[in-house]
Amino acid sequence: MPFSPDIIVTGEDTPRILLIVDAKLSSPSHPEYESQLKSYMLHMRCPTGLFVTPDAIVVYRDTYTAHSEKSVERVGLFPAPKTWTVFKVPHHGSELPSARDTHLEARFEETVKSWLEQVRNSPTDYLKEFPKETRDALTDYVVPALSQGVIRGSGPREWLESR
């Protein structure tokens, strides 16, 4: 299945993608996932990417130093907001999510989108709970994209089709 982010931030008056966000209930088990995210960022000329789970936020940035995935660097892995722990689910080794997990993943995606909107509207209030290193990374890479753009779901979701 080709990579597609869950949330995108585009310029207000342009289709340019400023930030992609992939929100999952757990880290993907296949190692090529990071490569797919980097490739998507590279091909869409997206400067910033996030992979978020209830446990962590991983920040990526494109340095535009090469025309390969090597130009997309992992800035760091940071703790997620404490309120996201309600979305933790046990992973039973199956790649196929249950109906309950699919519904929970949809709710998590909406929670992440809402959090991004809150950070955009009041970064100081919503970033103060994080350690300094996390605040700095989000302030340097994520807040500028949020302040310049519009936060959107990236398209139809599998969980919508199952309703």
For each feature predicted by the language model, list its residue ranges.
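Catalytic nucleophile loop
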Residues: 52-54
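A short, conserved, highly charged catalytic patch centered on acidic carboxylates
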Residues: 1-48, 58-163
